[in-house]
A protein has these predicted regions:
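C-terminal SET catalytic tail plus cysteine-rich post-SET Zn-binding segment of SAM-dependent SET-domain
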Residues: 2-3, 99-164
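Catalytic cores of histone-lysine modification enzymes
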Residues: 5, 10-106
């Protein structure tokens, strides 16, 4: 399995990653936003935390739902396909955003998405990755405010949108 990843992760990654991790992850109320995913035990840097699962569907079939803040679509394949966790999804759909994440989402060549630990994660710590949302319209303060970030990190961008 070829893994495309940033230099923030170790060169050798744990490629054995289950679709569900009740032994490792707990979904519960988050101080950041609604529900969140928390580590039931410590996780080492480079470990695969979970696969982000759901039905792979064309972006065009869900574009009208994308503005609904309760959606959990994960865009893949150059924005033409999304993973819809409403069908066949798992606890990964509850992972919240942070501008200072402890995990990173990695898309495989086959369109599967895995969440890897960027650093050691302590038992009880909430799991985060940077959503880095992309928009088709020009980036303005109004557009950024439509996807506000509440992560509270020292380096918070104030938006879920990708850094410019």
């Amino acid at each position: 399995m070829d893994v495309m990843h940033s230099t923030a992760l170790p060169a050798s990654l744990d490629l054995d990653c289950p679709r569900s991790r009740p032994d490792l992850l707990d979904v519960r109320s988050s101080p950041i936003d609604g529900r969140g995913v928390f580590a039931r035990r410590s996780i080492r840097r480079g470990d695969c935390v979970i696969e982000y699962t759901g039905e792979h569907i064309p972006w065009s079939s869900v574009a009208d739902q994308a503005d609904d803040p309760r959606t959990y679509f994960f865009g893949i394949k150059d924005g033409t396909v999304v993973i819809n966790p409403e069908r066949g999804g798992n606890e990964a759909r509850w992972i919240n955003h942070s501008c200072d994440p402890n995990c990173e989402a990695i898309e495989e060549e086959d369109g599967r998405v895995f969440i890897y630990a960027l650093r050691d994660i302590r038992t009880g710590e909430e799991i985060f990755y940077d959503y880095q949302l992309e928009v088709d319209e020009p980036r303005t303060p109004l557009v950024e405010s439509e996807s506000p970030c509440h992560c509270g990190a020292a380096n918070c961008r104030g938006t879920l949108l990708a850094p410019v």
